Every structure is written in C-alpha cells, then in structure tokens.
Amino acid sequence: MNVFDTLQQSKKLPDVYRQMTRVELEERIRQHKERLGKKLLMLGHHYQRDEVFQFADQTGDSLQLAQIAAKEKEAQFIVFCGVHFMAETADLLTSEEQTVLLPDLRAGCSMADMADIHQTERAWERLQLMFGDTILPLTYVNSTAAIKAFCGRNGGATVTSSNAKKMLEWAFTQKERLLFLPDQHLGRNTAYELGIPLEAMAVWNPETERLETDQPLENIRVILWKGHCSVHEKFTVKHIEHLRKNEPDMSIIVHPECTHDVVIHADDAGSTHYIIKTIESADSGTKWAVGTEMNLVNRLANEHPDKEIVSLNPTMCPCLTMNRIDIEHLCWSLDQLAEGVFQHPIKVEDKDRGPALLALQRMLDRA
C-alpha cells in the first residue's frame, strides 16, 4: 500500500479521544485487554512510544513479533503496534481465523515505499537485459508484501538485519549476483562485511531507471536499490568525530541501516536485538552513544540508569510514521473491536500471499 492509498482508506480519529485524559485512555485500554483476555494479542515494536509500548503483551522487532503472532493460536485479534509492512508480515504468518489490526493506517514506512512494485518489475526487466539470468533478488523484511512476493516468484528470499550476512552467503550459492531491496545501506554494509569491495557494488536508481556505477558490468556482484531509512540516515560521521573528541570513553554502536561511513567509523554495529543485548550485558558505568531510533534509545537509558546512554545524534527525533500509533488511536481501535468492528484490518492480497510467504519461508529455513 502506497501513501496515496493509505490517505484514502485511513479514518479520521474522532475528536472525543483527543479530549480524554491519559488516565481515562489507559483505563479503557486495560478494560478491553481484561475483557478479551487471550483472544487479544497486542504486539509492540521496539520503536513504539512508551504510552503504547506499555500495553504490549509481547515486544520485539518486526519478524519476531510476526512469528509470535503465528504461535499464539488462541489470539483471534492481533493489534500490531508498529507499521504497515510489519502487520502485513504478521498476516502472512498467521492463520485465516486470526485478524491483524493496525491502529492507525498512516503508520507506514518511507523506506518500504521506496521500492514500488511497478518500478521493481521494470528494473528487473532492464537488469535481466544487462546481466542475463545471473541475479537473485533479496528483500529486507522492511518491505511491502508485493516486494516480498516479487522475490518469492524469482527464487529470492527475505532477510533481517540479524541474518542478512547468512542470507547473502546463501544467495551467492544460487546466482552470481544479487539485487538487494529496498535499503541500500544494509545491503552495502552486509556485502562489505562478506568481503565484497565497494567497487563491485552498483546502485539502481528507480527514478532515473539507471544503474549508478563507473565499473564494467562484469565486475558488479551486488545491485543495491536506491532506498534508505530516513531515521538512520540522519546519523553522520561528524556526530562520531564530535564524540571521539569530547567523550573519548564513550562506545558508539549503530544499526546497519546507517550509511557505510558511519558503520565503519562506529565501534560496533548490529540489529536492534543486538544493540539491546549488547547494552544490557555491558558493565555498569559504561557510556554508550546509540545510532538508532530515539524511542528505543530513551527506553534503554531509562531501563539502565547505571549506564550513560545517549543518541549519537543529539537533535534526533523519533520515527514519525512509527509514532503515528499513539494511545488515542490504540484506544479507538479497541473500542471499535469491542463493538465488533475491525478497524484497519491488514490483509495481504491473494495474488501475493503464496509467493511472499515463500520468500519468508526460504529465509526461515536457512536462518
């Protein structure tokens, strides 16, 4: 679903919810959770704001949460406090008897939207002409169901930031080259970690429909889709240099959605799960600058007062689309559910379900 479809289908929050106090909203949500019991499963992504995160029955990254939903067979209603592609993945992995709901349909992902299926299919045709049948498509799970389905149809798979290295290794056993969607930075950082030189990577620009490289085509092994996370691109080498000068004893850990320059200048890089576990296990008194979403950084700081934890970018703000899920929309979604209304149900189109699930399963079987 692109941003225009979202705006057309999204329903406006009734004014009454903005007039309610935080206490009133929290109490109503608790009442719904108590009444529905195990029929309701509320999932909270790590980047959610605390006012919503507090109500989650399970927390984690996008794939973890989708897998949890699939295992919770008693849950008829799954309220996904995350963004659209995450709810789609949950819908793919759960049964037809389970309904996945997104409290605010405007909670999308700009990076996922950067890989439009029509642009991707045109790019694939062009790349096949350029390279022949030598390319395997891989997509980050932070992508639409349509892109996952595209990869499934063409022998490819999904990857997460945790298993990207393992999946790229697998991809190169299948084909000579790979197309990595939609985040160029995760693709570049992972390929570089595997020992592939930057010169062997090219960027496909979907706007100009051109391959951006100054190298001979036969030297290209990785084709990176020109997409990025608007949050993680805001971390720069200048932020790192400033900390090195002013806080030399502070460790810097970043997410691999950051640019390559940031990743190689940081002390460590890894998935959201890796960042959380690294800081949790760190010695008391250690100092950390974290290059990832602000809600998570603040939560880590609050949960570990014995350590100094700050954002790598001091002017960072939370992910705007993730922040669309607020306590008012959550309460409204549950009120509607109590009346038998499925507000903003997320359902992957039938034509995409099989191949998208195949792309996910290829990953789950190997990583």
Swiss-Prot record:
Q: Which domain of life is it from?
A: Bacteria
Binding residue positions for iminosuccinate: 45, 62, 140-142, 161, 255-257, 272
Q: Name one GO biological process term.
A: 'de novo' NAD biosynthetic process from L-aspartate
Query: What EC identifiers does the entry list?
Result: 2.5.1.72
Metabolic or biological pathway, per its Swiss-Prot or TrEMBL entry = Cofactor biosynthesis; NAD(+) biosynthesis; quinolinate from iminoaspartate: step 1/1
Required co-factor(s) are:
[4Fe-4S] cluster
Could you list this entry's UniProt keywords, alphabetically sorted. 4Fe-4S, Cytoplasm, Iron, Iron-sulfur, Metal-binding, Pyridine nucleotide biosynthesis, Transferase
Q: Does the keyword Coiled coil apply?
A: no
Looking at its record, which EC class is this enzyme? transferase
Recorded hits in HAMAP family, A to Z, give: NadA_type3
Task: Give the PANTHER family listed for this entry.
Answer: QUINOLINATE SYNTHASE, CHLOROPLASTIC, QUINOLINATE SYNTHETASE A
Put simply, this protein is called Quinolinate synthase
Organism, scientific name:
Halalkalibacterium halodurans (strain ATCC BAA-125 / DSM 18197 / FERM 7344 / JCM 9153 / C-125) (Bacillus halodurans)
Q: Quote the gene name from the UniProt entry.
A: nadA
